[in-house]
Amino acid sequence: WIMGHMVNAIAQIDELVNLGANSIETDVSFDKNANPEYTYHGIPCDCGRTCTKSEKFNVFLQGLQKATTPGDSKYQEKLVLVVFDLKSSSLYDNQASDAGKKLAKSLLQNYWKNGNNGGRAYIVLSIPNLAHYKLITGFKETLKTEGHPELMEKVGYDFSGNDDIDQVAKAYKKAGVTGHVWQSDGITNCLPRGLDRVKQAVANRDSSNGFINKVYYWTVDKRSTTRGALDAGVDGIMTNYPDVIADVLSESAYKSKFRIATYEDNPWETFKN
């Protein structure tokens, strides 16, 4: 999965997919009542990027739905996975459940069209704080209450705080999550970061009793870093330059080992070769 980083305006969906992304990451900011409000990152953000592009969250979802619905004039067949980077650190811990409920309602209405031919992409809820695990339970409960528990088949999870992997496992246990787990590791492109924790996450993924299904590394803009991440065995790379990642994947060392994921590839299944 080549994950286009910081896609917060509808026009950027086409821009990053056309450069080779089959996945995008979108920032979600919340108001003080835990309503998802804008797709917005803000300052500071990655080196070499504009940090302030934004849409109202529900408007962005409507654009995203068009981009991921076969038959729509804006349909992008390659776009199969969306990571919502939930900026829930602005909330009190006791608002996490409400944030999850409100997020589920927004997605249900504006993305899934209440189960009536909505967008088809898989969704990862990426949460920055282990204490906010109730965001997951609130989200799940709401889809059930609203009569669409089947949509949880399209939803996965990530805790993005670079926490100790054992602590991440505990948070999932509290949230009742077994499966659909993506594990991120990384840092802004302005700073270097080693691959030690990525390798730990990959080892967990590949062990018989691990809880992780997929591992992604962020934010990677250089060919050398891309090669390091691929050599470590990641499933996804988040980048500001999807074309750079696509280039490296076409190198002889990688093209026989990796291919770009399509809609037929289940993002919740651990890859076994």
UniProtKB/Swiss-Prot annotation:
Expression across tissues: Expressed by the venom gland.
SS bonds (residue pairs): C45-C51, C47-C190
Subcellular location: Secreted
EC number: 4.6.1.-
Catalytic activity annotation: an N-(acyl)-sphingosylphosphocholine = an N-(acyl)-sphingosyl-1,3-cyclic phosphate + choline; an N-(acyl)-sphingosylphosphoethanolamine = an N-(acyl)-sphingosyl-1,3-cyclic phosphate + ethanolamine; a 1-acyl-sn-glycero-3-phosphocholine = a 1-acyl-sn-glycero-2,3-cyclic phosphate + choline; a 1-acyl-sn-glycero-3-phosphoethanolamine = a 1-acyl-sn-glycero-2,3-cyclic phosphate + ethanolamine
CC cofactor note: Binds 1 Mg(2+) ion per subunit.
Binding residues for Mg(2+): E25, D27, D85
Class of the enzyme per the UniProt entry, highest EC level: lyase
Cofactor(s) needed for function: Mg(2+)
Pfam families: GDPD_2
Gene Ontology CC annotations of this record: extracellular region
Active site: residue positions: H5, H41
Keyword hit for Magnesium: yes
UniProt keyword RNA-binding present: no
Record GO biological process: killing of cells of another organism; lipid catabolic process
Keywords: Cytolysis, Dermonecrotic toxin, Disulfide bond, Hemolysis, Lipid degradation, Lipid metabolism, Lyase, Magnesium, Metal-binding, Secreted, Toxin
InterPro entries reported for this sequence: PLC-like_Pdiesterase_TIM-brl (IPR017946)
GO molecular function: lyase activity; metal ion binding; phosphoric diester hydrolase activity; toxin activity
Described purpose of this protein according to its UniProt entry: Dermonecrotic toxins cleave the phosphodiester linkage between the phosphate and headgroup of certain phospholipids (sphingolipid and lysolipid substrates), forming an alcohol (often choline) and a cyclic phosphate. This toxin acts on sphingomyelin (SM). It may also act on ceramide phosphoethanolamine (CPE), lysophosphatidylcholine (LPC) and lysophosphatidylethanolamine (LPE), but not on lysophosphatidylserine (LPS), and lysophosphatidylglycerol (LPG). It acts by transphosphatidylation, releasing exclusively cyclic phosphate products as second products.
Record family assignment: Belongs to the arthropod phospholipase D family. Class II subfamily.
Protein name per its UniProtKB record: Dermonecrotic toxin LdSicTox-alphaIB3av
Organism: Loxosceles deserta
